[in-house]
Regions:
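Conserved helicase/translocase motor-coupling segment
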Residues: 1-43
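A cross-kingdom feature that marks ATP-driven nucleic-acid transaction machinery
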Residues: 39-181
Length: 181
């Protein structure tokens, strides 16, 4: 079991920022074993599950796709350690120098969003993922704000298109969205 959990954690780290595919966790693990290992990591609070939501309205938790989730580590320091990244290098260089900068930004924003939730809620995080023929789109986070869905797109730097954010807003009639870096 310990090796399975290590493999699941490693897979969560490598798949941060995208839909988690259980069968990518280790060729020797079955879907069931990989799912159980990620659930143990979630129960231990080492990882945070981000649930896929259709974004049709609020509450966001009433509109989830249980087969599509993302995971982030509980702490950016753990992520940096597991990726063998040195904080001194991160501070002294440009974010563009790191291939992991987008994933790191997504973890940081997700953890801050979770901390900002009402103390009386479970702090669940949501994202939007659309798979269509020859087209996939994803918005990193969805929040409930003033009785409406608020999409949040995370970018590592000042550049980057927001096609998915604009697509979601157009499809669902959402007036306000946030892009952060």
């Amino acid at each position: 079991p310990a090796e399975r959990i290590r493999n699941a954690l490693s897979s969560i780290i490598s798949q941060t920022g995208g839909k988690f595919i259980y069968t990518n966790s280790d060729l020797q693990l079955s879907y069931k074993q990989a799912k159980e290992s990620t659930e143990l990591l979630e129960l231990s609070k080492l990882v945070v599950k981000i649930k896929s939501c259709h974004a049709n309205g609020i509450p966001l938790g009433g509109d989830i796709n249980p087969k599509s989730n993302k995971f982030i580590l509980l702490d950016t320091g753990l992520y940096l350690h597991e990726c063998d990244l040195n904080i001194a290098d991160l501070v002294s260089k440009s974010p563009a120098d790191f291939i992991n900068s987008g994933k790191l930004a997504e973890i940081l924003i997700g953890l801050e969003l979770q901390k900002s939730t009402d103390a009386f809620t479970d702090g669940s995080l949501f994202y939007w993922h659309r798979e269509a023929v020859n087209s996939t789109a994803e918005v990193d986070y969805l929040m409930q704000h003033n009785g409406a869905v608020l999409p949040i797109e995370v970018k590592a730097g000042t550049r980057g298109a927001m096609k998915s954010l604009h697509l979601l807003m157009k499809e669902k009639g959402i007036a306000l969205g946030i892009r952060t870096s």
